[in-house]
Amino acid sequence: MHLTVTFNPAGDQTLRFEEPLAPDRVSRASSARFDAAGKGVNVAQFLTVLSTDAVATGVLGGFTGAFIRERLAATGVSAAFVESDGTTRLNTTAVADGTEYKLNHDGSAVDPETVDAVVDVVRERTPDTVVVSGSLPPGVTTAAVDAIAAAGDWDTVVDMEGDALRTLNERYSLCKPNRAELARATGADVSTVEGCARAATAFRKTGFDRVLASLGGDGVVLSTGSTALHAGALDVDVAGTVGAGDALLSGALAAWADGADDRTALRTGVAVATLLVGQVGTAPPDLDGLDALRERVSVRELSN
């Protein structure tokens, strides 16, 4: 079972505008959608759609927390969140004139007792894999992430900001930075796919068994120590990019859980991410066409 931990989940609202945004005037959206989100929440939803056993935990509070609970229950996602006195944040993505504007809140402060309660949930569930992902709200440090990794005999996956990744002290089975996070974590030149592969391989040696780096339109790189693989992105119309990295990670994790090799896991991750970016919002995509997309993804070995 995969247990996702999201200390800073969010209600996501996505607004589309037919006209460019401009200051000092009211801009009226032509459409709006609302999703339960936060990186770990996204991963739990995607894994569930991919028929991989998953439970979402973390911290929820207020009206947005209630919305996330309701939405997860309605979509069949198992959840075991800890209630907080604060209000879960509401993030906004505005899409106008071909541009995405992402407006995120830092999140409400979380007290030490609530953090300890989340760690207790992880212990009680005894998962095979724990996925800790997303930003950390005020009051939560990477010490909490290390505590989760050290609390039991499970694989721990992290998907966090680059600065946070550098302060982790435990050993992790997988790290999933994007290109900017990989650059912040390593200080390396990541302007090319090959540069990203070298940076991922170097970063792996700091405490990660594998590094899965998402590169946007350049695809994804996986460094395992013995090899480095690159999977190219597919050329499709992009409606939105929010949640693409979570979809990539979920597809790869689901494939590995089914016993797939690394190449198949990369193909699956890219295919799931491709389906997601073809729609607006972070709700799990319809998986029709997944197999056909997976067959189109090319994977090559890079110099490690």
Predicted regions and their residues:
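Conserved post-catalytic alpha-helical subdomain immediately downstream of the catalytic base
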Residues: T206-R210, L215-G217, G232-R300
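Hydrophobic anchor at the start of a short beta-strand
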Residues: H2, T52-A54, A79, T156, ...
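Conserved phosphate/ATP/ADP-binding segment of small-molecule kinases
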Residues: D146-S226
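Short, conserved phosphate/pyrophosphate- and ester-handling motifs at nucleotide-, phospho-/glycolipid
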Residues: L47, N178, G245
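Glycine-rich phosphate/adenosyl-contacting loop at the front of the ribokinase-like
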Residues: M1-T57
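Conserved N-terminal subdomain of the carbohydrate kinase-like
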Residues: E19, T48-T129, L293-N304
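Short, small-residue-enriched loops and turns at beta-alpha junctions
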Residues: S108-D111, L136-V140, A164-R166, A183-R184, ...
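Short beta-strands and strand-loop turn motifs
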Residues: K102-N104, P127-S135, D159-M160, K176-E181
